[in-house]
Amino acid sequence: MQNSRPGIQKGARAQRRFAWCASHLAFGLALSLTLLGCTSGPPAPDQGSYVEELEAARAARDKAYRESEDPIPAAKRDTLLPLRYYPPDQNYAVPAQLSLFESRQEVEVPTSTGTLRRMELVGTLNFTVGGQRVSLGALVPAGTRQIEELFVPFADLTTGKDTYKAGRYLDIPPTATGLYTIDFNQAYNPTCAYNESYECPYPPPSNRLKVEIRAGEKAPGA
């Protein structure tokens, strides 16, 4: 699984382990906030606790990046840390329905280094955000048997302006019901946003939203 994670540094096993661990340390807390499941499940947390826990998760990510050798080079840490985010906004935590394909579609996803990464499209997440009905493709690494996480790279109308020019990522645990909460407050930059030695997949054309997602992480230094 480590080799399949977004944001892998070429030729360095230790860096691959970091790419796997850093994103989970950073957003493991945040992912638990929205319960990412059936809309008939437990009620959403109140705004106060939601903001506190989201900000704690963001602070944990800053700490991990400041104390680790990668992905942010030491010379850039004072400039790039703390990471920049939009203010938390629960209007960007929206219910979604996953429509699974009868069989997975193998795709070759372009990356920041000019290579292609083999992945599988398992279905589409359909939802409404910003008053528009939209969808995002959900991917897994090629050859994945048991899905532990849906990888959702996306771009939107803030991309290249307030947010990173190559798009952002969401990691979403699967549910048994096909009902989800997509929380764009948890959207984060690929590691190549901070270090060009990493190889990061780009969002496919179908995952380029024609709506502003003013939530989640901003471009480095924005």
Where are these regions (language model features)?
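Mid-length scaffold segments of soluble, non-membrane domains
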Residues: 102-165
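N-terminal secretory signal peptides
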Residues: 50-124
